[in-house]
Regions:
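Positively charged, small/polar-rich N-terminal and surface patches that mediate targeting and assembly
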Residues: 1-98
Length: 98
């Protein structure tokens, strides 16, 4: 099993907020493709005097097969385009179910 963490920006690169409808579409697609997800927290930080509260972490637990990895890579490319981002951080961690 694998846990994938998607760090979803809530603002465009110019600092303007991403429309809530786009974030809703992301959630709907994740639910349709993977069957479930969790949103455990938001991330905030300061940089060069500016305050940022703009990252929503979404977790998905699923098999770690190649099909899932391919779908996530395709999903990431769509996110980068629709949210106008240079990159979207997606990490993976092996998990063991007890």
């Amino acid at each position: 099993m694998k846990k994938y963490e998607i760090y979803l920006p809530l603002n465009y690169s110019d600092g303007q907020p991403i429309e809530s409808e786009k974030i809703t579409r992301v959630r709907e697609e994740l639910l349709a493709v993977f069957g479930s997800f969790a949103e455990p927290y938001r991330r905030a930080w300061k940089y060069d005097g500016a305050k940022y509260i703009e990252i929503l972490k979404i977790e998905i637990i699923t098999t770690g097969n190649k099909v899932i990895k391919k779908r996530l890579k395709e999903f990431k490319e769509r996110l980068k385009e629709s949210l106008q981002q240079i990159d979207i951080l997606i990490t993976t961690h092996g998990i063991q179910v007890i």
